[in-house]
């Protein structure tokens, strides 16, 4: 029997996503499994929440409109929130994009490609954040 590699640290998961339907889907799936969720509708809002609060992990879309995208959120976390460096999951509908491929290859951060199923999401969430 192997030990779970990631332990749940408690606290909410920060969900950074600009599409309301994806936010609703992710929030419902995570809350059904016992996670609490705080959402941010843009990368800028996500950075504000990260600056002010404590989170167990972050799930962020890579491509979002506005001044701050998911790659920039990822870079900010690496620099400013070392406790979250390995507790990030990226989501993207465009993993064929060369910038996205470079980010994923260089960072080793888990990425879930849209569209995805609840079980696929939860498998990555539990491996990355642990179970509540």
Language model: regions and residue ranges:
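Conserved Asp/Asn-Gly motif in the active-site loop of CheY-like receiver
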Residues: 40-44, 70
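Non-catalytic signal-transmission and effector/linker regions of two-component phosphorelay proteins
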Residues: 1-14, 79, 84, 101, ...
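Charged docking surfaces used in two-component/phosphorelay signaling
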Residues: 24-32
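Hydrophobic/aromatic residues positioned on beta-strands within the core alpha/beta folds
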Residues: 89-92
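Active-site residues of response regulator receiver
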Residues: 61-62
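Short hydrophobic/Thr-rich beta-strand motif most characteristic of the beta2 strand and flanking loop
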Residues: 34-41, 49
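Conserved acidic carboxylate
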Residues: 17
């Amino acid at each position: 029997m192997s030990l779970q590699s990631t332990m749940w640290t408690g606290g909410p998961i920060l969900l950074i996503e600009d599409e309301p339907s994806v936010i609703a889907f992710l929030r419902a799936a995570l809350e059904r499994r016992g996670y609490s969720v705080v959402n941010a509708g843009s990368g800028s809002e996500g950075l504000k929440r990260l600056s002010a609060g404590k989170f167990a992990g972050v799930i962020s879309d890579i491509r979002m409109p506005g001044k701050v995208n998911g790659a920039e959120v990822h870079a900010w976390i690496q620099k400013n929130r070392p406790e979250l460096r390995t507790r990030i999951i990226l989501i993207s509908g465009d993993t064929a994009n060369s910038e996205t491929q470079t980010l994923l290859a260089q960072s080793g951060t888990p990425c879930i490609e849209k569209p995805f199923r609840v079980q696929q999401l939860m498998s990555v969430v539990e491996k990355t954040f642990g179970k509540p």
